[in-house]
Amino acid sequence: VYAGKLHSEKSDEDHPAYSAAEKRNVSFTWLGAGEKIQAGECVMDILGPLTLDTEDENNNSLVLNVETPEGNFLLAGDMTQTEEEELLNAGVIPRATVLKVGHHGRDDATGKALVAAVRPQWAVISTSSQERPDTPAAQVTETLALFQVKTAVTQDAQVGILAELENQTATVWRVDWDGKHPLEK
């Protein structure tokens, strides 16, 4: 199990991920900005958070860039536009083939500056409007449309969304119980 070094819990032992891993006797590693994990040809770069946000725990969520020879995924975690701005100002946000939209597509994340810097072909929004009726926020979907980013929303699939990369191009599938179905190219 991996978790971000920066969190607002009283101690590392109070972090829910740490407690869960310890309870199940699973190895646990704290990660921070600048660290990398290699898995075959895949490299996962931890981009942020750069600083602890004591006001909004969402901004302490890990932000990851997963690089493959075929393209890359930027996984924005739950970061809001505050953290986006900090990472953009630090120059650590890369272009990405696929962007996993931050904070479940809420209106406090995935600003124009981030989308302009990343220039993704596809964005994936992990949300459920049954649980959060305000997601995905119109502001977020409008920003993605402004930059001509194709969008997949997890609640539109029975199982999930699958993104495959080949030659710096993403193919995205809606996965239902009867198999996978390609989304618009």
Task: Locate the predicted segments by residue.
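Non-globular, low-confidence helical/coil segments that flank catalytic cores
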Residues: 1-185
